[in-house]
Amino acid sequence: MRFIALLISFFALLKVISAISGVDISSASTIESFTCLKSAGYDFAIIRAYESLGQVDPNGPHSVYNARDAGIEYVDVYMFPCPTCGNGAGQAETMVNYLKGYNANYGMVWLDIEGPQYWMSQSENVAFFESLVAGLKAEGAHIGVYTSASQWEPIMGGYTGGSEFPLWYAHYDGNPSFSDFSPFNGWSTPSVKQYDDTGDSCGLGFDLNWYP
């Protein structure tokens, strides 16, 4: 019995050790900032590459470079689309091609779905989301979705089409675990959690994220 208890404790510890912490940013950065974050134990970064005004983020490619040059192993980007600007596929393709123009080396593209007040009717929102997805798929992007039940449901209603993609969800409880997660709209298990939005060190403001 004692052996079983020790074994359970070992696997629990192994899971904690294998989990990694990361940041997401929406501002300009430097290599020095990411080197500092790397030294502080952050191993992944998610960089804003498209702004909600309907334009690419000019800081995006350079922040991808900076994170890579600082030794951050996992670097993704996120897209904050402009629903009322229309042409989701065009927005997605513009962002991807802008990053390609800089030879920015990143993994996932996370679609940031939040702020119901900035969206349209639920049927229009679903169509716009599917257009974004089509544009990213046409460019060969690996897609994920950043949202939470409180944001997704007012925007998309009962639509479950987003659940074919990994979920990065936000809940600012300061707890780097999925113990708080409740399934919604087809997502039964999340991939990443944004658990704190008050990160401020190494010359950067950032959100804190956790990946098991």
UniProtKB/Swiss-Prot annotation:
It catalyses: Hydrolysis of (1->4)-beta-linkages between N-acetylmuramic acid and N-acetyl-D-glucosamine residues in a peptidoglycan and between N-acetyl-D-glucosamine residues in chitodextrins. Keywords: Antimicrobial, Bacteriolytic enzyme, Glycosidase, Hydrolase, Secreted, Signal. One of its GO terms (cellular component) is extracellular region. Residues 20-212 form the Ch-type lysozyme domain. It is found in: Secreted. Its EC number is 3.2.1.17. GO terms for biological process: cell wall macromolecule catabolic process; defense response to bacterium; killing of cells of another organism; peptidoglycan catabolic process; signal transduction. It holds the Pfam family Glyco_hydro_25. The keyword Phosphoprotein does not apply. One of its GO terms (molecular function) is lysozyme activity. SUPFAM superfamilies: (Trans)glycosidases (SSF51445). Residues 1-19 form the signal peptide. The active site is at D24, D112, E114. It comes from the Eukaryota. Belongs to the glycosyl hydrolase 25 family. This is Probable GH family 25 lysozyme 2. The lineage of its organism: Eukaryota, Amoebozoa, Evosea, Eumycetozoa, Dictyostelia.
